[in-house]
Regions:
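NUDIX/MutT-family hydrolases
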Residues: 165-208
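N-terminal leader/linker segments that precede catalytic domains of diphosphate-processing enzymes
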Residues: 1-101, 105-123, 127-161, 179, ...
């Protein structure tokens, strides 16, 4: 299967190529292991790794619609490699239709963020909460479409059960190895101008995996997770 998928990236006039791949040749197999990922997420939580400063998203987004949470479910593949579960959202959805995303959604009133991420993963891909051990979280971000503060949680699944997509929300469930994500022909950075901000620019992170293109908020989350491992 060829790299890239049906997703359309709405590049603005004036965009340009960004920095080269920051991970290829630098991240080892050990650094891509579950144990190293868990250790680095713990360092982020305790402040040994500085949290990202500045706005939740570039360009800045005014958060007006509460909170959301997503789950990056990691598991070991048949060769011992670390893999992550992704979904292609249904083309029938009103927002981010057809885009690649982690399972997740809005947080209900009085609901804890990680509980919402687990609940949504169960609803969208049939991954029951008892199969997941939360090992950390990334900084929240937001999108101009959702206008919700999205908190990404990282979980480890010891034995991945059969997954079933919710017909209403998910068109495809797939997984990809972290090793593939750092390959030069998979990843690229693009620099986009910020509308109505003279000289303003922001980075867009794109991953061309087999059959799909990951970008936007999910691309930014994957970029952050991989960058933590250096």
């Amino acid at each position: 299967m060829a790299r890239g998928g049906p997703q359309i990236i709405p590049r603005p006039a004036g965009w340009r190529a960004g920095a080269p791949n920051p991970w290829h040749g630098r991240l080892t197999g050990e650094q891509l292991s579950i144990s190293h990922i868990e250790s680095r997420l713990a360092d982020l939580k305790t402040g040994r790794i500085p949290a990202l400063a500045g706005p939740l998203m570039r360009p800045p987004v005014l958060v007006t619609k509460g909170q959301a949470a997503v789950l990056a479910a990691l598991f070991k593949g048949s060769q011992g490699e670390t893999r992550v579960v992704l979904t292609r959202r249904s083309t029938r959805l009103s927002t981010h239709s057809g885009e690649v995303a982690f399972p997740g959604g809005r947080v209900d009133p009085e609901e804890e963020l990680h509980v919402a991420a687990l609940r949504e993963a169960h609803e969208e891909i049939g991954l029951a909460p008892e199969h997941v051990r939360i090992i950390g979280q990334l900084e929240p971000l937001a999108t101009r479409v959702s206008r919700a503060a999205i908190t990404p949680f990282v979980g480890f699944v010891d034995e991945l059960p059969p997954l079933t997509p919710s017909p209403r929300e998910v068109d495809r469930i797939f997984d990809v190895s972290l090793r593939e994500l750092i390959e030069p022909d998979c990843y690229r950075e693009e620099i986009w101008p910020i509308p109505d901000e003279v000289g303003g620019e922001f980075s867009v992170y794109v991953f061309e995996v087999e059959g799909d293109t990951v970008w936007g908020a999910t691309g930014r989350m994957l970029h952050r997770l991989l960058s933590l491992l250096l």
